[in-house]
């Protein structure tokens, strides 16, 4: 649509109106609210438990678990960016967002999405060094290197979405812009504009492709080398032990990219709009809720640390 057709607000700052899931009857809003609330609480508790376990247990003060802390922190921030507003929408009918709030939510959602992809690459590199270069592992993965890798992942992810957000903020909108989504997803905000959406849609697609496939390629490359090293181990017990150190990370990577695949398939043009929205909602919730379960059930060290914390008697006497 031509920008001249816009009925822009006098102060130039439009208000965004979230339409949520358009075909969902209001009678289902309360059940959906409780479902999302349950998921959100599980995400917060699961990831907080991982954080407490790693910090409190000295045996987990290793590079692998340092990066796990980053991943759990990301999962908490990632869902907190979107889910509270969704809860407010379904419980209170709170659909309005200011221009700046919407852009901030969009920026944070994109940044944390990128951060998760990059942290998974760093975790794959950690497993690569541990299995392919075990004798050099303490030197290569020292605390300074770990902090640099994590900081680089966060900083790159914080910078990458800025051009898309700035360009989106410069588009023309009606005084009340209707967003067909439960939160301010980039594509949904762009489509709410009355400017030409093609350049911004292409930019968003290109960023999504880079963030999705380049990290995946690096993860796969790491595991090709890991597999080659494991196959050179003569004993079956040694192979099984090497693979077991990677199993949790592999499951997390599989979950993350499965949720991305669901979101991409949902954006097919021939699917109803509700599929687009639900695909993104699944993407926003699936990985953060499964990551703690995977590391709790599959990783013996984390499982033992959590069991130790949960079994402690808060009323026991402590030495002064």
From Swiss-Prot:
Residues 1-31, 84-102, 167-200, 267-276 are extracellular. It is a multi-pass membrane protein. SUPFAM superfamilies: Family A G protein-coupled receptor-like (SSF81321). GO terms for biological process: positive regulation of ERK1 and ERK2 cascade; signal transduction. Detected in the keratinocytes of the epidermis (at protein level). Detected in hair follicles in proximal outer root sheath and hair matrix keratinocytes (at protein level). The chain crosses the membrane at residues 32-52, 63-83, 103-123, 146-166, 201-221, 246-266, 277-297. It comes from the Eukaryota. Its main location: membrane. Belongs to the G-protein coupled receptor 1 family. This is Olfactory receptor 2AT4. It comes from Homo sapiens (Human). The gene is OR2AT4.
